[in-house]
């Protein structure tokens, strides 16, 4: 049976970007290929029928999406003031790092590299290749894991009137004090933040109160998506995507490699 699978960005994150003012609670998204701004259900956006097998779907649910869903729910409640404090446990941090690694593995860039270098890819079905890349990729150890081991997990809180957007790629890199940080938006007002251990925030939160910083972060979101997939950037606000749409002609050619 072919399942309608989220290729990369899981529904447990995407649903947090629904437009709550919309009676249908759909997600706004910018198609970075066409520049069109459209709406779609979070259950359908970024999906492909038969992309993963039932076994592949269970693998992602057990290893990534179920633990991530619990963490993102807590982050969202903290951002909206529904809970007074937020603690990131060692298990939470491990789950967040697995999410980032999984995003690398599930990108179009990773799939293209596998198809280019694998001696068996051409003899297997696309679905089998996707499943194998998921299983072996998540269990492998290489430069991605080495870099993630040197980072601590914090939470970024958006205290501005602007909204964070999220790429299909799940995360993006930003540079602070000449050091790369990983940002993975999980709701319009919050993101998972990975930074070098020596720069980690006391109390495990970093607060952004300048709307210009959020605008810059959203541009990095667009750049990351252009680099890894060239698919879409999603938001709960059409306004944020209208602003990014004006950046598209500039960023198509100027976004340099961020990997």
Residue ranges and their predicted role:
Residues 1-259:
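Alpha-helical structural context detector biased toward long hydrophobic helices
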């Amino acid at each position: 049976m072919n399942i309608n699978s989220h290729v990369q960005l899981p529904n447990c994150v995407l649903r947090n970007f629904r437009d709550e003012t919309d009676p249908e609670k759909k997600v706004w998204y910018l198609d970075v290929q066409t520049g069109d701004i459209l709406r779609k259900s979070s259950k359908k956006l970024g999906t492909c029928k038969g992309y993963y097998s039932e076994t592949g779907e269970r693998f992602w649910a057990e290893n990534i999406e179920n633990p991530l869903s619990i963490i993102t729910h807590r982050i969202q409640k903290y951002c909206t003031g529904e809970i007074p404090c937020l603690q990131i446990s060692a298990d939470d941090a491990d789950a967040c790092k697995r999410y980032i690694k999984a995003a690398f593995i599930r990108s179009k860039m990773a799939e293209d590299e596998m198809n280019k270098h694998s001696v068996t890819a051409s003899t297997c079905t696309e679905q089998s290749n996707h499943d194998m890349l998921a299983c072996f990729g998540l269990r492998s150890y290489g430069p991605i894991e080495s870099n993630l081991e040197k980072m601590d997990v914090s939470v970024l809180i958006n205290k501005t009137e602007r909204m964070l957007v999220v790429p299909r790629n799940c995360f993006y890199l930003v540079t602070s004090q000449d050091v790369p940080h990983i940002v993975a938006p999980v709701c319009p007002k919050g993101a998972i933040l990975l930074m070098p251990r020596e720069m980690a925030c006391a109390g495990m939160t970093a607060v952004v109160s300048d709307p210009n910083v959020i605008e810059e972060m959203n541009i990095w979101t667009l750049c990351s998506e252009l680099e890894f997939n060239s698919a879409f950037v999603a938001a709960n606000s059409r306004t944020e995507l209208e602003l990014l749409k004006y950046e598209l002609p500039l960023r198509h050619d100027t976004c340099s490699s961020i990997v």
